[in-house]
Amino acid sequence: MKIEAVPGAPQDGEFEFVLAAEKEFEEIISISHGIYGGLDYLPSRYHSWINEKDRMVVLAKKDGTVIGLLSVFVVDGGETALLEGLRVAPWERGRGVAGVLQRFCIKLVKHRYPSVKVMRLTRDDKLSAKELTKYRVIAKQGILLLSFNAPDLASRLSSIPLPPAASRPPPPIELTPEDVRDVFLERGGLLKDLLPNQTIIQDWQPFQALPGNQDLLRRKTLCWMVDDLIQPQVATLCTAPFPVPAGPLCFYLNIDVFGSELQSVQEQLLSHLHAHVPKLPADVRCQLFLPPNLWRPMADFCTLVLGLHLEKGYTEQYLLEADI
């Protein structure tokens, strides 16, 4: 779908910018091979993204061929533009396509949504000195990437050796829709002491704990857990598993962790695994985003106690912000 003329947008005769449609799906998948180490979420989300309210999925084309994609999602009551899903065709990488596409998308979102004040994005690689001057770092989390075979783990979950019940924290509490509503009170409500900058980071997507984001997150299939309803020290947010290109029948399980009480994090991880693993058919990539100081003890727990495979060493997720 053609995009209207956007005042101030980059003018480059080489590129045509259009809104993505169903017909471009296969072409986009063909330029996405190897993206995000086989954990690319776009194949599972593309069809809903192109129809989602307040989201624009913008394609860059050259000679009629798709060479780049970037999604812009307006959240936080119309004040924030989330930049997601960036990719450039392999033969065009290193030629400035990503920068041109990002600049166009920023002009487009400001043209359509004048209330937008900042852009936010998440990254999982080291930031250059130039990037550190361009963006504010709003939050930093450790990334723990694990893998396992679901039927194998399901057969072992009930027999995993754990400390005696008397020395373990109380069982995790799954939040009801009414409890979740309390998360979106002023300054994060129930979770105000746990959220980085009052921001809920859900599977790479940052949302401020504002009433305007409540319905948006309620539409997702999420499981929220806390260790205590009055004064939680740990909260976790698990996204429903979805298929990824890492392998045949491979599913991705994402768990975002807020809080640093180790035993409560372990208990909540086990509860999420009990809920999802028995329903999955084969291999799983499980990614936990957690406070950096928890990475090593949780890596040891997952490998030595749960018998999961550590896919890679310590890396970090950065939540970045810039005024626009």
From Swiss-Prot:
Single GO MF descriptor: L-histidine N-acetyltransferase activity
**Which CDD domains is this protein grouped with?**
NAT_SF (cd04301)
Q: Which UniProt keywords apply?
A: Acyltransferase, Transferase
Give any extra note attached to this record: Strong histidine N-acetyltransferase activity has been detected in ectothermic vertebrates and not in endothermic birds and mammals.
Q: Which PANTHER family match?
A: LOC100145250 PROTEIN, N-ACETYLTRANSFERASE 16-RELATED
Q: Can you tell which superkingdom this protein's organism belongs to? A: Eukaryota
- Please explain the role this protein plays, according to its UniProt record: Enzyme responsible for the N-acetyl-histidine (NAH) synthesis, which is a major constituent of brain and lens of ectothermic vertebrates.
- What protein does this entry describe? Histidine N-acetyltransferase
Spell out the reaction equation it catalyses. L-histidine + acetyl-CoA = N(alpha)-acetyl-L-histidine + CoA + H(+)
Residue ranges of every copy of the N-acetyltransferase domain listed in the record? 15-151
Q: Looking at the keywords, is Nucleotidyltransferase present?
A: no
Q: What InterPro entries does its record include?
A: Acyl_CoA_acyltransferase (IPR016181), GNAT_dom (IPR000182), Hisat_C (IPR056483)
Enzyme nomenclature, EC number? 2.3.1.33
